[in-house]
Amino acid sequence: MARRSKGRFIDGIVLLDKATGMSSNFALQRVKRFFNANKAGHTGALDPLATGMLPVCLGEATKFSQHLLDSDKRYLVTAKLGQRTDTSDSDGEVVQTRPLEFTEAQLMSALEHFRGDTQQVPSMYSALKYQGQPLYKYAREGIEVPREARPITVFELNFIGLEGDELTLDIHCSKGTYIRTIIDDLGEMLGCGAHVIMLRRTQVAHYPYDKMVTLEQLEALVAKAQEEQLDPSSLLDSLLLPMDTAVADFPEVNVPDASAAYLMQGQAVRVSGLVADTLVRITLGTERRFVGIGEMNQDGLLAPKRLVVLHDQAKAS
């Protein structure tokens, strides 16, 4: 007998504004509990030190979390110049202290080095795995392991200000970019060392900054619902963004009702007007109900790749 899943069927994306000092998984579990969701997943961890946008996918939205993981990100970062730490942030131990002896022109020249397409060697204090273990576990044991440089793109690197020994930058970058590594490398280029003291993720993909909510706000809504003897979902669910916003950049293909049943059974259906090998967002019928993503093949057929479970059908079956 199949084990019954706990929690309710609720699909959507919460733009959580993660607070500092907590892990991304801790934040995820709190959101899942507030919404009483049957399943949840985040779209790229933030370090405990970091704050800001952490999209949390609930229910069927978890099927599309990888697309947000692969998306561009934007960060506001403040670095302390003159001190290098073993973790490249303020959670680590200071390993070197040097005076600030660079000019403004040298700073601007150094910043230019990081713009565009570059190669980055990930920090030992990262979640990347080597022989099945996260790098940070080796680092904590004092073990250095080989890491290959990876291609990254910094689309924008904007100088915000320099006050004393604190430098603030705005960075728009590709997936897999380690801001701590940029700051550490910048400090070495300037000859003084540097580490991150504040890191805030301000954007993931196209999601708006003003749609973020904190755990405290969610907790307050749950408390309000209890006081007014309401179901918490009546106050919380309006905060959810539609799950297809995770793949909003994909072109839409609307499948007519006549072909919908075939598609939902995993069969390819014929559509026209799109190039082969194109990933698309699939909607059904006149209601344009989002049901997943698919790919156009060489024969002009739309092959489903990732379909959602329609809960009204699930209950009926």
Swiss-Prot record:
One of its GO terms (molecular function) is RNA binding. It catalyses: uridine(55) in tRNA = pseudouridine(55) in tRNA. Keywords: Isomerase, tRNA processing. It comes from the Bacteria. Coiled coil: none annotated. Its EC number is 5.4.99.25. It holds the Pfam family TruB-C_2. GO terms for biological process: mRNA pseudouridine synthesis; tRNA pseudouridine synthesis. The keyword tRNA processing applies. The active site is at D47. Responsible for synthesis of pseudouridine from uracil-55 in the psi GC loop of transfer RNAs. Belongs to the pseudouridine synthase TruB family. Type 1 subfamily. This is tRNA pseudouridine synthase B. The lineage of its organism: Bacteria, Pseudomonadati, Pseudomonadota, Gammaproteobacteria, Alteromonadales.
